[in-house]
């Protein structure tokens, strides 16, 4: 139902008063966005180095070490396209590979994402809505989290939000071809950064389809030659990489062997509300009181749905944002019943549509509903603050780098270092300061099936050196080995069990869920045995 004339007059008066107050502030009114970006930067750089590098980050760093030609080859065997890794390689050459430096390459785009979100909101709605959206975006826990990892997700947010902004400009003024050129370049960059960019293409086509319902036949942008030419150009720009993508699709079974895909939990009825909690609270919410677990996500989905349904503005801004948030979420959820890919980090960019749309919904409320609008804003900010608390609750003294540094301090020449899992291996390489050849424990299954990684997924980072890295049995260690470091989970069962009877535990160090253990091998005549055997 359309708002009454009285409600619209109330809204116009409120917005006029708000904008008048800003105009009276003089030059300060032009810097209203600065505190928002300052908040976004403070949150994304806070505790940036508190958590240790984990497996996925380690894989980014190993990929970035390759020469340009080799990087292209290995990225073709990884589960992500190469652009981020090329950029990370250049960043490290300029600023080094210290943990603050490499994570800054994600934190800075994370701040840019907030700025783009504010800009997009201002183009779609009022300055008040842009301020509200800016605060919610700056605080959004999922955006903060993935702005603090050496991965491509914050960079992807820059490409996709900027592309959406360029599309909005073009829709308003179709004669501005440069907006469409910018759109093409940004979407191509998105495709070279992450395969889920395809979801953004669907969002944009769907929005133009919605606009068709209110456009005369000759004005329908979705049928414009320029639009089709732009999409064809994106495909042409992607052609150099397309054979690699097709090759990857044909080797899904190899990716499953290495645990790169196929590890995700099957989806259920709880998955969608749980994902919304994950975006905002950094917790799946499964331990929350059941009515609250359902009510809060349903409230947000209701706000999204009602705002989009009541959207009667010419360019349907609420419809664009609802599609940006809901279409990828629900599509990936549906696909996950066949092949589970319902993962927070793959959708975190699209989650940015939620706070923007909530801000616009609050801004559109008439004055008589300002109190419920304020309550919704405070509620969402409160949940986000709890999510930030969960993000920043990190014990710096219980991190994976602790056991690695323990090994570095106590390492002796000719010691062997064996790791039980690929993710431990990828993290360990970053912190390792020894001259040892790290080895990955790959015991065959009970039926004799090998567990060695292959040339796809994480395996592409080590497979070329597999002969030196893979260790199928502890008994395969050289006969003259005297000391062995075992790196594994600190939980049972022991991934190296059973250990040879002549191994003696000398010391160990836990941290970040891992355990480093030093064993001496008590072999040969007693006088020749290493210290610890006597």
Give each language-model segment a name.
Residues 14-533:
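Terminal, non-globular segments
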Residues 2-9:
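N-terminal intrinsically disordered, acidic low-complexity segments at the extreme N-terminus
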